[in-house]
A protein has these predicted regions:
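The feature represents the membrane-entry module of six-transmembrane cation channels
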Residues: 1-345, 349, 485
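Eukaryote-biased feature marking scaffold/signaling PDZ-domain proteins and nuclear chromatin regulators
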Residues: 31-34, 54, 96-98, 194, ...
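Ankyrin-repeat-protein effector appendages
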Residues: 272, 439, 467-479, 484, ...
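Ankyrin repeat domain, specifically the short helix-to-loop turn at the C-terminus of the second helix
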Residues: 294-299, 325-334, 338-340, 369-377, ...
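Ankyrin-repeat boundary/linker signal
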Residues: 304, 337-339, 346, 381, ...
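Start-of-repeat signature of ankyrin repeats
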Residues: 308, 341, 349-350, 385, ...
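Ankyrin repeat A-helix N-terminal signature
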Residues: 314-320, 345-349, 356-364, 390-396, ...
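Solenoidal tandem-repeat scaffolds enriched in leucines and small polar residues
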Residues: 406-409, 413-417, 421-433, 439-442, ...
């Protein structure tokens, strides 16, 4: 595993290839003492990752600012709101300064050649894995791997031993297609998804940073990344889809071995149940005995006491529809509250099997239908007050729940947010938004709790990673959503806003507290605060008023974050003169 020191990386004024860096003696082999930073990025050219030298300075500037303390990397606000409040520690920022970079263009040979040995047909698992990768990447090969094959097949290992994972996703244009590349498009790329999943499956708890600009760095929200299997991504070379399958399979098996050894049973069972979905395989057919063995249950009776991922969740997540009636007849509650210990806090507690089925098993709608047949409650809110409709990922799921008397406008405490707002904030496809509107979901309502809960405002929260954002916004505006509507927080959340104001005035730098003080702003203000320039531009073009103040007297433009948003605002103001 070749690495480039951070000091040498920060001095680069171009993107040298692996061969050039090697020739200059700048690459060093990894040692256990190195603080290794794995860089994942979308290439901006067909034969070169950064032909116009646009990505490189963004990453250099972001690292400089993290090292100096000028910017802080924290969890996104949605994660912070439910208690998943993490930040890059001072020690980790200092480790960056003496760290070492792994980036494909730097550390994988770009000039390929066959290595002087052949596979001997050994049954060894590692050798069999390499044979598969080589045969798919080099179909004309007679069994001799190339130098590049070895490096690509080792990506899970490279991620596993890294101390930090960085997704480099600034908004830039592809040099040959002129199409925009950003976090949304990064999430569609098969190889990027693979690297991302290798990080999530790794035994280490390496921080996952998302770099969107020189001053926009945050810790990734793993909840929304959990439903992006690599094989469903886009590939420039179609045969790479099968290569990724084998690499992902290897990473999954390694993760399961580690989880079983550590006896992290919730995450182990969750991963076993998702195994086929993550690889694009059909649902497994397990008899009762095999079901208990695969999920490591000693008996069905003892499994009833498991508060986390139990038999019902395993059957549901793995798509074993035929097991659900049996479990229902054995006394398992279809609407029970799950308290699981996973590595995604937003998915851990206060959830029901139906919630998870709608969010993660939407590829097999029969699972949710079977839960409903056995009296899963289509209206029962979870601990956050979110009704099952808020987790729908397909129009068919919305229709199914409505047929089971789900209320499309149901709001429950503590959040008091209707399904339409939840779907907008969780990046649901625009078809889901359309179906909710078809069933008379309200686009305007008086807030009962949290500020900024209007659907148009909710779209802004994850606009930078939501490929459906603008299409959904158009649907809402066509349904007569008021582009400048804004309502103050009420009750407990009004008190929370007052406390947040006091904390910010007292010197707190918490981005969550800053948002809470400003959440009475209009959708444009929310978009400016969360820093998505595309959505800001869309709202301005649709006639949003940039001068409407919130409860603190601040206008949307005064809440702007990120250089790209500031650029959009500057262009708008110049055009308006």
């Amino acid at each position: 595993m070749w690495l480039l020191s951070m000091s040498d990386f920060l001095r680069l004024d171009h993107m040298p290839s692996h061969e050039e860096l090697h020739r200059k003696g700048l690459l060093v082999p990894r040692s256990r003492t190195h603080f290794c930073i794995f860089i994942s990025h979308q290439w901006l050219g067909p034969n070169h990752p950064d032909p116009k030298l646009q990505q490189l300075p963004v990453l250099q500037n972001a690292f400089r600012k993290l090292i100096s303390g000028e910017i802080k990397a924290m969890s996104d606000l949605s994660s912070q709101f439910v208690g998943d409040s993490c930040r890059l520690s001072q020690k980790e920022c200092m480790n960056l300064k003496s760290g070492y970079i792994w980036l494909d263009w730097f550390c994988i040979p770009q000039k390929t050649f066959e290595l002087p040995f052949e596979f001997d047909g050994s049954s060894d698992e590692d050798m069999a894995y390499m044979v598969k990768v080589v045969s798919l990447r080099s179909p004309r090969s007679r069994g001799s791997p190339s130098n590049q094959d070895l490096f690509i097949s080792s990506i899970p290992f490279f991620v596993e031993v890294s101390d930090m994972f960085v997704a480099l996703v600034p908004r830039l244009c592809h040099s040959s297609t002129s199409l925009q590349c950003n976090f949304k498009t990064y999430l569609t790329r098969g190889w990027c998804r693979l690297e991302m999943w290798c990080n999530m499956l790794a035994a280490s708890s390496a921080p996952f940073l998302v770099v969107k600009g020189n001053d926009q760095v945050e810790l990734a929200n793993l909840t929304f990344l959990a439903d992006h299997p690599p094989h469903e991504g886009e590939f420039t070379v179609e045969s790479d889809r099968r290569v990724v399958y084998y690499v992902m399979q290897r990473a999954l098996k390694a993760s399961l071995r580690t989880l079983e050894k550590q006896q992290r049973w919730d995450l182990f069972r969750f991963t076993v149940a998702r195994y086929e979905t993550l690889l694009g395989l059909p649902p497994p057919k397990r008899d009762f005995k095999l079901f208990l063995r695969d999920f490591r249950f000693t008996s069905l009776e003892s499994a009833k006491k498991i508060p986390g991922i139990g038999p019902l969740e395993c059957a549901m997540l793995s798509g074993q529809v035929d097991m659900i009636p049996f479990l229902a007849g054995s006394g398992f509650e279809m609407s029970r509250v799950i308290h699981a210990k996973l590595n995604m806090k937003m998915m851990q507690g206060k959830r029901s099997p139906l919630d998870l089925a709608l969010q993660l098993v939407w590829r097999n709608p029969d699972v949710a239908l079977e839960l409903l047949k056995f009296r899963a409650d289509a209206n029962r809110p979870n601990g956050f007050g979110i009704a099952p409709l808020g987790y729908c990922r397909t129009p068919g799921a919305v229709e199914m729940l409505v047929q089971h008397r789900a209320d499309v406008n149901k709001r429950s405490g503590p959040l008091f947010m209707p399904p339409l707002s939840i779907c907008c904030s969780s990046c649901a496809p625009s078809g889901v938004i359309s179906k909710l509107l078809e069933h008379q979901a309200q686009v305007e309502f008086q807030s009962k709790g949290v500020g900024g809960s209007q659907p148009l405002a909710c779209l802004a929260v994850f606009a930078s990673s939501n490929p459906h954002c603008l299409d959904s916004a158009k649907l809402l505006l066509d349904a007569r959503s008021q582009i400048d509507s804004h309502y103050p927080a009420t009750g407990f959340f009004k008190a929370m806003e007052m406390v947040a104001r006091a904390r910010v005035l007292g010197g707190s730098s918490s981005s969550l507290l800053k948002y809470i003080t400003e959440w009475s702003t209009a959708p444009l203000g929310v978009a400016c605060f969360f820093g998505d320039d595309e959505y800001v531009d869309f709202l301005l073009s649709a006639g949003a008023d940039p001068d409407i103040p919130n409860a603190r007297g601040h206008t949307p433009f005064q809440l702007a974050n990120g250089e790209n948003v500031l650029r959009v605002i500057e262009e708008f103001q110049e055009f308006s003169i």
